Amino acid sequence: MMAKNNKTTEAKMSKKRAASEESDVEEDEDKLLSVDGLIDAEASESDEDDDEYESAVEEKESSSDKEAQDDSDDDSDAELNKLLAEEEGDGEEDYDSSEFSDDTTSLTDRLSGVKLQTIVDPNIYSKYADGSDRIIKPEINPVYDSDDSDAETQNTIGNIPLSAYDEMPHIGYDINGKRIMRPAKGSALDQLLDSIELPEGWTGLLDKNSGSSLNLTKEELELISKIQRNEQTDDSINPYEPLIDWFTRHEEVMPLTAVPEPKRRFVPSKNEAKRVMKIVRAIREGRIIPPKKLKEMKEKEKIENYQYDLWGDSTETNDHVMHLRAPKLPPPTNEESYNPPEEYLLSPEEKEAWENTEYSERERNFIPQKYSALRKVPGYGESIRERFERSLDLYLAPRVRKNKLNIDPNSLIPELPSPKDLRPFPIRCSTIYAGHKGKVRTLSIDPSGLWLATGSDDGTVRVWEILTGREVYRTTLIDDEENPDYHIECIEWNPDANNGILAVAVGENIHLIVPPIFGYDIENNGKTKIEDGFGYDTFGTVKKSNLEVNENGDGDEDGENESAKNAVKKQVAQWNKPSQKQLEKDICITISCKKTVKKLSWHRKGDYFVTVQPDSGNTSVLIHQVSKHLTQSPFKKSKGIIMDAKFHPFKPQLFVCSQRYVRIYDLSQQILVKKLLPGARWLSKIDIHPRGDNLIASSFDKRVLWHDLDLASTPYKTLRYHEKAVRSVNFHKKLPLFSSAADDGTIHVFHATVYDDMMKNPMIVPLKKLTGHKVINSLGVLDAIWHPREAWLFSAGADNTARLWTT
């Protein structure tokens, strides 16, 4: 019994020592740990590990106690009772009143003597359900070297953009719900400098966690540079490791590899021969068909079993190179309908006329007929004849293949500037000069630009003030009783503004008038210039040839013929002093010609003017000199019907326009310089550009022709804008403008730029179509002329009015 008591006491003491040692270890661990009132994540993890460890130790101790109990069960019941009695006695002794007294010691004092024991083995031991040991290892804490997808973000606002916090002092909230304040921003100058001088690692993005700019670190920049240079990004990898030649690359001759070739390699295979003979027998018997023969059989079978699809799409076959397809028949018209409109049916007179004409001369080979239904239409009787004639045409008529050019039509249209950029030019009618009782055939503008003279079929010449439209002068030059067939054909002011002479062509006469509207000085200068020519022949200043003609009047026949020629030459026109009646009409002198004068044009100096008489033969063109009262006929032979004649603006050249040609003569050398071929059927008028290197001509076949005298004799441009005969064309003296007037009652205004560079062609741009004159008896605008300085246009029409068109 004593021994057993000693054992129990020793067990109790050992338990107390173990408990005291555990308390000491725990106290030492508490000293090592710093507890500040906050539970750290790592501390919690270690506590959890300790709890697991303690539970495992307790389970181990309980298991040992159970084993001891099992051993004690083997003792006898008597010994068990004795032990129980001793334990009860000991228990009564152990329980003391002091243990149940109030303990005033603190937890710190109680744990002051406790010592903790650290275990080196990190594994935790447990048991499975079958009783075997189970080792619970600690959790693995992975280290993320390159992936931070599971890392917690500092700013927990989710997918909300940072722009939602622009008006707030913070940029979001952290995991604890506290605000993340916005970082301080620099001044506008600092932001400007930062945008100019970009810092290293600048990305232009905002960091969602801090609200500041997101810059790349040096490691990230180095990584990007390595990727750009195609280098290794991991420093632990050695790209130049030493080569270990595990297997030799040199083939060695060994007994296993240098075996001699067997004989069967050089002897034909009997097995292959059997297989080949088997295939040959199958081909001979027809069980195997070669691919070529099989293809031929399929094509033959396809041709034999071919069925034409009547309603399928037609497939085009490749024609021969020399094959020309027949041209398609024109589609049927309304006349060929079985139920044509009434206006296509022929009247009895038209049917009779159609039947009386020859078959080859008929406009159509059938008579349009009307049927109430398509089923009532009979067969066409001329179908066989038409097919036969078409076959003859295809067989006998030669045909040529014409390759169609694939050209974009827009590429052929020249790129012209907008008319808005080419102003000024006339666009509206501002003044109407009304008062004439007949057609206004001609008009002319004074060199000063103040007075407008018009000539009409009523036999009057009127002078108008341009700005006000007031009539300031009127004279009647045609007496209907004496000369009923005369008209005022042409009227032209002298280009010299200091004399005020107005030349008027009336029938066969040319009147030089000085209207009393300028003042004494100008009127006196004009009359003096005209009167000075009367003394030219009086004082013996006649040509010697004319004197010789007069002296050889009684000579031989040759002398008589020569004198007759000179006499005719001298009598081409006669300068007559005005009668008293003509003086009352302000006529200073009258030049009488043989035929009707249609056109008149002054030289730029104002001393010469040229007239055109289309019906006068070789004397159709006459040059008159005012200062000497002389008239010359420069041509000995007629060059067709002359329509117009003009002087060159500054060269001694004369432009003569016939019905189809324009000839340029040099008056100083008396030679033909150039012959222009406009290509028109009947020219009406010409005008020369102020620079003298371009010419425009109008024709009665509705065309306006532009000739560049430095280029070929054919037209540079042909303008077909009018619908009827073009009567007049005129260049502006100062501005790059020209106009054309026609019988359709319209006036077309064009912009014409002539470049100094000889390599550039003139630029012609249509600007405006002026309408206002009425068409009377198929006559519209008869004449047009430009103002000397302004972009104003004057026009004369068959509606008895003249108009001023301004910008």
From Swiss-Prot:
Keyword hit for ATP-binding: no
Biased composition (Acidic residues): 21-30, 42-56, 86-102
Subcellular location: Nucleus, Nucleolus; Nucleus, Nucleoplasm
Compositionally biased spans, kind Basic and acidic residues: 57-69
GO molecular function: DNA binding; large ribosomal subunit rRNA binding; ribonucleoprotein complex binding
Gene (UniProt): ERB1
Entry GO terms, CC: nucleolus; nucleoplasm; nucleus; PeBoW complex; preribosome, large subunit precursor
Record protein name field: Ribosome biogenesis protein ERB1
Region (Required for interaction with YTM1) location: 383-419
Pfam families for the chain: BOP1NT, WD40
SMART domains: BOP1NT, WD40
Stated role: Component of the NOP7 complex, which is required for maturation of the 25S and 5.8S ribosomal RNAs and formation of the 60S ribosome.
